[in-house]
Amino acid sequence: MFLRSTFVAALVACLAYIHLGDATEAMPKVQIYSRNVGELGKPNTLICHVSGFHPPNIKLQLLKNDVEIEGAQQSDLAFHQGWHFHLTKSVAFTPKEGEHYSCKVEHSTLREATRFTWTPDM
């Protein structure tokens, strides 16, 4: 599975670079949310979805109290017409009082790594 994902990501990146003249640089639109209503103490899935970005090189990290959460799964890099890309990263979690969850995004269009915070639906 890892080799397949790596191959697909490399292929998409190569295709994007071949067609650089067809795309313009674009910042990622970032959405961080939970699969179910965010309730403290209830198992859930934390999701970070980034879309509309170019070039394709991007790094996503799901964080709990500013520390990367182990075991997160990442989708294959995909693109829309105009060579704008989208990617999703998710992980199982059980939110507790006092914990802070965020998605850290690194992309060439951002001056620095940027954190986007998840807020429970209370």
Curated annotation (Swiss-Prot):
Protein name as it appears in the record = Beta-2-microglobulin
Organism, as annotated: Acipenser baerii
Family of the protein in this entry: Belongs to the beta-2-microglobulin family.
Q: State if Transmembrane helix is listed as a keyword.
A: no
Q: Which superkingdom?
A: Eukaryota
Q: What does this protein do?
A: Component of the class I major histocompatibility complex (MHC). Involved in the presentation of peptide antigens to the immune system.
Q: Which cell locations does it reside in?
A: Secreted
Q: What is its main location?
A: secreted
Q: Disulphide bridges in this chain?
A: 48-103
InterPro entries xref list: Ig-like_dom, Ig-like_dom_sf, Ig-like_fold, Ig/MHC_CS, Ig_C1-set, MHC/Immunoglobulin
Ig-like C1-type domain ranges (all copies): 28-117
Task: Kindly indicate where the leader peptide sits in this chain.
Answer: 1-23
Which gene name does the record give? b2m
Keywords linked to the UniProt accession: Disulfide bond, Immunity, Immunoglobulin domain, MHC I, Secreted, Signal
UniProt KW ATP-binding keyword: no
Tell me how this protein assembles.
Heterodimer of an alpha chain and a beta chain. Beta-2-microglobulin is the beta-chain of major histocompatibility complex class I molecules.
Q: Name one GO biological process term.
A: antigen processing and presentation of peptide antigen via MHC class I
According to the record, the segments passing through the membrane are none
GO cellular component terms given for this protein: extracellular region; MHC class I protein complex
